[in-house]
Design a protein with these regions (language model features):
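N-terminal helicase ATP-binding lobe
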Residues: 1-189
Length: 189
């Protein structure tokens, strides 16, 4: 059974949520979480409900939403503009095709930054982006957040810079061994 969710930062179309999605959201809003759901079971609505709530709860902070590929990033950007009730200009999508100085300027007024992990990593290392004022970082396809992958590096940078921020890793495939799953959970925080 699903219910329509009403929130000031969700569009009038509202998102339908099932009980398991609301239970997951409750956990996400209180502690860093690895969300594992099969494809098609509604990870994106959970992510967007978390974005809506964190922007509402901490309007002076940002949310960063990472995706490993530009096509996936574009889909999340489209979904965010459709389902979030925040000024459209405060939702930005940045990738390596945009000059870092322009990205820096765009990020200053953004509430939601959708980006590839390489861009965030490079901008943080360069000093053109700070993660201190980020209340939530979402790592979509979180199974990539291992080893020296840019997703893992950004997660580490975020956990080192953010005092009270939350990390949400979402994936349908956390790993094939207990060790890889435990490593991913430890990496997410």
């Amino acid at each position: 059974m699903s219910a329509r969710i009403s929130h000031p930062n969700l569009s009038s179309e509202n998102i339908e949520a099932r009980a398991y999605q609301l239970k997951a959201l409750k956990n996400i809003l209180h502690s860093s979480t690895l969300l594992v759901l099969p494809t098609g079971m509604g990870k994106t609505p959970i992510e967007l409900m978390a974005v809506a709530d964190k922007i509402y709860e901490s309007p002076h902070k940002k949310v960063i939403f990472l995706a490993p590929t530009n096509p996936l990033l574009a889909q999340h950007y489209k979904d965010a503009k459709k389902f979030l009730n925040i000024p459209e200009e405060s939702i930005i999508m940045i990738n390596g095709g945009i000059n870092w100085e322009k990205r820096q300027k765009m990020a200053q007024s953004a509430k939601l930054i959708l980006a590839t992990p390489q861009v965030i990593r490079n901008d943080v290392i360069r000093g053109s982006l700070s993660l201190v004022d980020c209340s939530l970082m979402i790592i979509d396809e979180a199974h990539h957040a291992s080893g020296k992958h840019a997703m893992a590096q950004v997660a580490d940078l975020y956990l080192n810079q953010s005092n009270d921020g939350l990390l949400l890793g979402a994936t349908a495939s956390p790993g094939s061994t207990d060790k890889s799953i435990i490593n991913l959970i430890n990496r997410i925080g």
